[in-house]
Amino acid sequence: MSNLYSAGTPHIQELQNILDSQQEEWAAIKENYTTQNSLIAKENCTLKMKLSELENKVSQLIRENVQLRSQVSLNKLEFQNKLASQINVLENGVIQRLEEVLYMFDSIRKKESLPSRPTSTNETVDRIKKRRQSNEEARNRRRSRSVSTGSAHSTSSMKRRSSTFGEDLIDASIKRALDNAQSNSLQTSDTLRLSELPGLNEIDTNNVNNDNLLSPIPHKKRKSNRRKSIYVPELPKPNNEPLMENTIEQQENICSESLIQEGEQSEKLGENLDADQSHVEDQSFSFTNSVLEYSIPEENTLPKQDILDETEKRDTAVNQKKKLEIFHDPPVEELSSSKNEKPPENSITNDPAFITVTGNNKVKHSMKSRKPKKNKGSVDESMPCTQSTESVDFDRPRRTRGKTVDYRLPSLRAKMRRPTEKLVDATTTVNIQDLQVKYKKSKKVLEKELKTDMKAMKSPKKNEKTFESGTIFKKISRDNESRPSSTHSTSSVDAECSHNNSHSENINSSINDTTHSSFNNSTKSVLSDITNISKNKQQQKTKKLLKTAIINDIYDDKTKNAQKTVSFRVNEDDLSVFDLIQHNDTNKSSPKTYRSRSRKNKA
């Protein structure tokens, strides 16, 4: 027994080891499955929550739908009630007016002693009401028949079609049938009323009915309808055939025939639609396919060549219709022959006489002869463009007026900003003489000052003071170079007065008064030597920029002292720092023009 036990122990140990290892694997697999189960449970919970939310939303939508339907139905009922009441009011009003009209006719007959009508007004009104009731009954019958035919047609076609599309088609066919039936019934009722009214026995009711039935649908107004006003419409010729009284049975026969025809047409339409849907089994009929065919060219089933051919044909037709000969229209026969015989496409393109009129080159409707365009020698450069715009063909506007653009040369803006084509650097100089502002007195002002001085000389009281002070002839002494400026003798004054007598003769009396008054007032003043200032001073004119140099003189033209003591320049070109030497009044502005020079030389 001991040998068996000793021999069996290692096998048991191996089995135990295998069991331990498998147990670990089982534990790992268990953990994985538990985690997966927990995740799945969480996802199920979230899905349940979402489903509950969706159910709540669906229930809310259903409630809203029910409310909206109830509102729509109530609105429809209200609208129908309003319509019915309004129509009843209108009908009663029309009947009342008819009664009034008939009463007027009867009263006129009585006044004029004419034979009265065989039937009274009340009887006519009763007849109209009976006709109304019979027409309503006929309409109800037609509606019931049309509904029955529509239901039979819908049961046969609903098997192959979608529910919404079939219902819409049935409703449309029923509406058409009802509209036609109503129009027919109205026409027949109109003919009956015309037949019963007195004085209208000459008109044929059958012709009226046929004209109404066979009348075309009113077409849309176009521009060509203006020409129709040229032709006067002919009046309808009355036929001499006997009258045919339409009864209610004839009305019903006509309406039943129209209903049968419309039922056949609707059945044919349904069969055609069924056949179309048998070809397209899986594709649902929708409006998007038709929209895609027209709007998106990639989704279109037609090949591109067919589309291009169609567009070319349209363009050629439009070009053929355009009128080139403006002042000469061909006769009607030629137009009809040209319409019947279409010219080939090659003849239009190859014919040199045929001018293709584009949007840019329009035919000008004027009597003036067009001048031939001059071919300019210089060719304009093309505008820079990208690769996408190179394929587009259209005439670009000219950038310049026939001049080629050379981008190497400086632009006009650069020329305006700098004085020359050279670069501007720090070595450039500015001429200060160009910035001079010089105050030059005009000849008229100088003459006026001389005249005032001469008047002051004539007055006896002021002569002594003027001789003593010597302030009257300051400006005269500046102009005269040879005469000294410091001392004035009586002889020099007399000479100047005799020289300027010619100027003093033209002075007005007003100036004399002003000068006398000024001198009388100036006797009391302390500064008697500078009181000889005229009151009527001219306004200073605007300063002008002159090109002569600025002389830094203390005693320039505006100074009132007679003598120049210091001057800062010997010559105008010299620097002002070294102008410390006194110089004579020989440096004057030279005359600029030939005329002024000649005058100076003569003087």
Curated annotation (Swiss-Prot):
Job of this protein: Plays a central role in chromosome cohesion during cell division by preventing premature dissociation of cohesin complex from centromeres after prophase, when most of cohesin complex dissociates from chromosomes arms.
Any one of the GO CC terms: kinetochore
Protein name: Shugoshin
Any Gene Ontology biological process: establishment of protein localization to chromosome
Region annotated Disordered, chain positions: 112-164, 201-227, 331-399, 455-519, 583-603
Main location group: nucleus
Bias kind Low complexity: ranges: 146-157, 201-214, 483-512
Family of this protein: Belongs to the shugoshin family.
Gene symbol of the encoding locus: SGO1
Keywords: Cell cycle, Cell division, Centromere, Chromosome, Chromosome partition, Coiled coil, Nucleus
Cysteines paired by S-S bonds: none
InterPro entries: Shugoshin_C (IPR011515), Shugoshin_N (IPR011516)
Signal peptide annotation: none
Source organism of this protein record: Candida glabrata (strain ATCC 2001 / BCRC 20586 / JCM 3761 / NBRC 0622 / NRRL Y-65 / CBS 138)
Superkingdom of origin organism: Eukaryota
